[in-house]
Design a protein with these regions (language model features):
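Claisen-condensing/thiolase-fold acyl-transfer catalytic domains that form or cleave C-C bonds
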Residues: 66, 70-73, 77, 97, ...
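Phosphate/pyrophosphate-binding loops at sites that engage ATP/ADP/AMP, CoA/4′-phosphopantetheine
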Residues: 72-87, 228-244, 292-297
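Flexible, glycine-rich active-site loops centered on histidine and acidic residues
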Residues: 139-172
Length: 303
């Protein structure tokens, strides 16, 4: 009989996944702290000291999440050296979709010509990209698809209150994409947790703007992220010294520094692009991944 957990060697169950291409896109308009301080009671020094952010990219009128997502997707497909027709599924993580439906993924499909792909969006705020990656990973491991395009795309500038200085200074717009493919070696592990007690710490309603309890989110992240990192390292039998980069969601430089300290890992192993991008929500991890890739800082086999 078949016993769960008993896997035959050489079956599809052994299939793992790897990133075979990356791409990113940000709006050309840059909004720096000095310009923010012309219409908000804030200053460059105040923002930088608390967040590490100097500037952020802001979408022009009519520049949508799908437009940025499609730009990032085209670059990722080119980087992977494949044709758009080879993409079998497109998953877009976004909290700022063009429409409630059609999904942003459908709009991307249309723009890039991935006519054979299954398409859907996924909404999980800043963690969206990781959830989308875990779904793509599961699809490939199950043998359903061979190549999946995973995108994080946000135009947060359209949903923040530009009079709320505690929130609007944090966010930026952008999109990052990866093509996930099959890999017979290596191991991909996802461990996703959600804090059941803090659902209201960061909200975006249908009628109003983003509302955030920054202090609560900060203390949660500094406490919980190191635990999750340790869990993944243990499960993959990897020592923290073997890890080249820890690529975290780019929410706040102070937060990332605190996490590095708690893990007792040099902060240099935590790449950041907050200074020029701000918090791009679901786009932050894939945008950063693509930047590292373009700077030739990633080598196949890196952890």
């Amino acid at each position: 009989g078949h016993f769960p957990g008993k896997r035959k060697r050489g079956t599809e169950a052994d299939m793992n996944t790897k990133i075979i291409g990356t791409g990113s896109a940000v709006p050309s308009r840059v909004l720096d702290n000095a310009e923010l301080s012309t219409f908000l009671d804030t200053s460059d020094e105040w923002i930088r000291t608390r967040t590490g952010i100097r500037s952020r990219h802001i979408a022009q009128e009519g520049q949508t999440a799908s437009a940025l997502a499609a730009q990032a997707a085209k670059k990722a497909i080119a980087d992977a050296g494949i044709a758009a027709e080879q993409i079998e599924a497109i998953i877009v993580a976004t909290s700022t979709p063009d429409y409630i439906f059609p999904s942003t993924a459908n709009l991307v499909q249309q723009e890039i010509g991935a006519e054979h792909a299954a398409c859907f969006d996924l909404s999980a705020a800043c963690t969206g990209f990781l959830y989308a990656m875990s779904v793509a990973d599961a699809y490939i491991k199950a043998g359903m698809y061979k190549k999946v395009l995973v995108i994080g795309a946000e135009v947060m500038s359209q949903v923040v209150d530009w009079k709320d200085r505690s929130v609007c200074v944090l966010f930026g717009d952008g999109a990052g994409a990866v093509v996930l493919g099959e890999d017979s070696s290596g191991k991909s592990i996802f461990r996703l947790h959600s804090d059941s007690g803090s659902a209201q710490a960061l909200t975006l309603g249908k009628e109003n703007a983003v509302h955030m309890n920054g202090r609560e989110i900060f203390s949660f992240a500094v406490r919980k992220v190191p635990e999750s990192v340790k869990e993944v390292l243990e499960e993959s039998e990897t020592a923290k010294e073997q890890v080249k980069y820890f690529i975290l969601h780019q929410a706040n430089a102070r937060m990332i520094e605190s996490i590095a300290k708690r893990l007792d890992v040099p902060v240099e192993k935590f790449p950041m692009n907050l200074e020029t991008h701000g918090n791009t929500s679901a786009a932050s991890i894939p945008v950063l991944l693509d930047e590292l890739n373009r700077q030739n800082r990633l080598i196949p086999g890196d952890v």
